[in-house]
A protein has these predicted regions:
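Short, structured "edge-of-domain" segments at secondary-structure transitions
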Residues: 1-219
Length: 219
């Protein structure tokens, strides 16, 4: 297995899981990556070299990469800029990541979904099967309206509970099953009504365990 780390500034690397020694609970931890002063680790995944990483950009495009294609780096390296690994436009930025199983497995891709949320409260659900045929230049994942941008993308089983939180302090929860699957070029439907034009969605989570707790942290 490997550990994939992604920093806020968009640096990515994979490191063998064996480089991380088991510690007792309450320890000080180990260094996972070297970052610049203004950068910090933002995402971490554990997977295998044969899994796929899906990258979703703020303009609504999706790019693929096999995990083994992600540059390998030690715990003390910062990794490579994602912008240099995929054919992303210069004024675009990767906003969300999904680590999936084999995209050639028809049973798998037909039973999982990608649900996306935008800054202005749109949500869209699409079958994972529609992302199973990689193209070097990426594909359109969602049509983004003017002044909006993609914020989050999550992999779901079709029966999750979806929660959206907005900057003004409100949140909404709804059943994913009530959101019908759409094609990749659709712009989605309203997930939450914003307070005013200055309000925006700040996060989305998908929950399968109805006994789970949600931790909300303000700045």
């Amino acid at each position: 297995k490997v550990v994939i780390t992604i920093s806020h500034a968009g640096y990515i690397k994979r490191t063998p899981l064996t480089e991380y020694k088991t510690q007792n609970r309450g320890g000080v931890g180990q260094k996972a990556s070297k970052t610049r002063d203004e950068d910090f680790l933002e995402d971490l995944f554990v997977g295998t070299n044969h899994q796929y990483m899906l990258f979703f950009t703020q303009k609504g495009k999706c790019f693929w990469m096999r995990v083994y294609e992600i540059p390998e780096g030690s715990k003390n390296s910062k990794g490579r800029a994602i912008q240099n690994l995929i054919n992303i436009e210069q004024d675009d930025k990767v906003k969300a990541f999904i680590c999936t199983q084999d995209l050639k497995d028809e049973d798998y891709v037909n039973n999982y979904f990608v649900i996306m949320a935008t800054k202005m409260g749109q949500v869209k659900k699409t079958s994972l099967e529609q992302y199973s045929r990689p193209r070097s230049n990426g594909i359109n994942a969602i049509t983004i309206k003017d002044e909006d941008e993609l914020l989050e993308a999550k992999l779901t089983n079709g029966n999750s509970q979806i929660m959206l939180a907005v900057e003004s302090g409100k949140a909404i929860r709804f059943e994913e099953s009530k959101t019908r699957p759409m094609g990749r070029n659709a712009s989605g439907v309203r997930g939450i009504k914003l307070k005013d034009k200055n309000d925006q969605v700040v996060g989305m989570v998908s929950v399968n365990d109805m006994d789970a707790n949600i931790l909300v942290v303000s700045e």
